[in-house]
């Protein structure tokens, strides 16, 4: 009863542990994965010299848990219903598809099958003979039985990426929104420009980790308002820092006259993302310019 007011959804529930009065058992009661209760229970039990009690099925059967994977890689999950289907399929011994827009380190966990953007299994020929990879049409020439792949995980920054009938999207925070604007541009105009970026690109808003601009805009109320609304930091750079950014950018004589640098939105986005790759070049409308860059990001499997 005491925790009832705090129980809302799997994505926001807090970690809750229960310890008996003798300190013999530490039970992970709520939010074992996303909230970190399972890991906390193990650490607490070690300190108390108690017995940890973890009841989540994927942990008991040593199966891949998409919510744990997302948390360890600092990603957001979309479609928790599909995430449950992933766990259920793995526990039932079925294959689960895995597609990623990003490179991966380590081997895929047991039960996951690497797929392309259309949900079709793909495989490396490194350790398979040609005969092994062409056993029958049921194996689609990949060495993997395709008939049981009904659900899967997609690591993506795009809202439209759904390779599987039931797709769990895992979205990394790796994008930077570069912005420039007229002085004292209203917050509504800034917000509308940002929304148009999402509409045009199909990027998840949750894939953005920061907003970037020139230091002349560090007190720009409209951008500060967007930063607060999206709950991400707003970073700025000097004219000299932006000039040093390598690459080819969309020049503007007017912008250079005002700021001293030929482009603000593209250069600031690239610089903030660690000299990352431009995913959307400069677009301008109603006194606001925007660009999107992505920092280098990889998936890590233990």
Label every PLM stretch briefly.
Residues 43-52, 82-92, 235-244, 266-275:
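Short, surface-exposed, charge-dense and proline/glycine-enriched linear segments
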Residues 187, 221, 300:
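Short acidic, gly/pro-rich beta-turn/loop elements at beta-sheet edges
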Residues 38-44, 74-85, 225-239, 261-266, ...:
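Short, Lys/Arg-enriched charge-dense amphipathic segments
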Residues 1-38, 43-78, 85-218, 295:
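Conserved mixed alpha/beta catalytic, RNA-binding, or beta-rich assembly cores of soluble enzyme
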Residues 195-196, 206-269, 273-278, 284-288:
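C-terminal non-catalytic interaction/assembly regions of soluble proteins
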Residues 151-163, 167-170, 269-302:
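C-terminal edge-of-domain segments
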